[in-house]
Amino acid sequence: MIGNRKVKDVNTVEDPSNLSPATWRLIDTGVSDGATNMAIDEVIMQSVTEERSPPTLRFYAWDPPCVSVGYSQSVRKEVDLERCRERGYTWVRRPTGGRAILHIDELTYSVVAPQGEARVAGDIITSYRRLSLGLVEGLRTLHGGVVQADHMEADGGLEKSAACFDVPSHYEVTAYGRKLVGSAQVRRKGGVLQHGALPLEGDVSRLVDVLVLPEPDRAALRGKLLERAIALDEVVGRVVPFDEVAEALTQGFGSALNLEFTLGELSPFERDAVEGLMSRYTGDEWTHVK
């Protein structure tokens, strides 16, 4: 047990030899704004589901920094938009569930596959657990203390906040008993999209500055996040470059899930579809529907 969470050795969870070999597409789309990043993820999901594209592992980053909220959250109720403007942050509503994340100084991954693909088959928690194996396997090449934790409920009596990294999830990726990767998943029309944020460096409590909170609650949540979340630089003892982390995760997914990857890019169909979705992710009808 680490902290208040049970942990399992990743090597005991699932034998990758049980999965038939497969080849997926690997895409690094670099840096984009929040609306573009969410549009790309949704379009890849559509393209893979329609068999226009193969299952895809994608890496990306965000500029300007962006607060994303889960599908069921309310931007206006959870996020102080004036505080965001003062700091140069944007905001976007994700197609996936979960809670708010400030995307800054991070690597984001996304996995898209048909629901029948063995690596995402089963219910959401089963597939989340399986995909976490790839994250853990890759991050362990950077530091051996990264583990996959059993699901544990939040401490009794403490109200859950709007922040993703404050809320324990099933089989989360942790180091030193603190959450290292925050992931969320959605299933639609036979496809699965899971994406997640890995803070590479910096203060993991910065999100607190832009949430709608009374000042005493803001200070309390900041303390909780610093206790419950961690950035990769604190784990490894150095700032690991984006490309090095992406390479480690690619190898981890390959080893843990018996995958090979073919380096690719967005197809012409996907690029055109992203342009068509931009008005949705930048518009009030989607962003402020809750």
Regions found by a protein language model. Give the residues of each.
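Short connector loops at helix/strand junctions that flank enzyme active sites
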Residues: W62-P64, E86, L102-E106, P168, ...
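Active-site loop/lid in soluble adenylation, ligation, and acyl-transfer enzymes
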Residues: V10-E78, E82, E86, T90-R94, ...
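Gly/Ser/Thr-rich beta-alpha loop segments that engage phosphate groups in nucleotides
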Residues: S72, R99-A100, A184
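Extended cationic-aromatic binding surfaces that line active-site or macromolecule-binding grooves
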Residues: W62-V75, L107-T108, V112-Q115, R130-E137
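A glycine-rich, hydrophobic loop/mini-helix early in the fold
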Residues: E78-V120
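Catalytic beta-strand/loop module used to bind and position nucleotide/cofactor moieties
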Residues: Q115, R119-S255, D284, K290
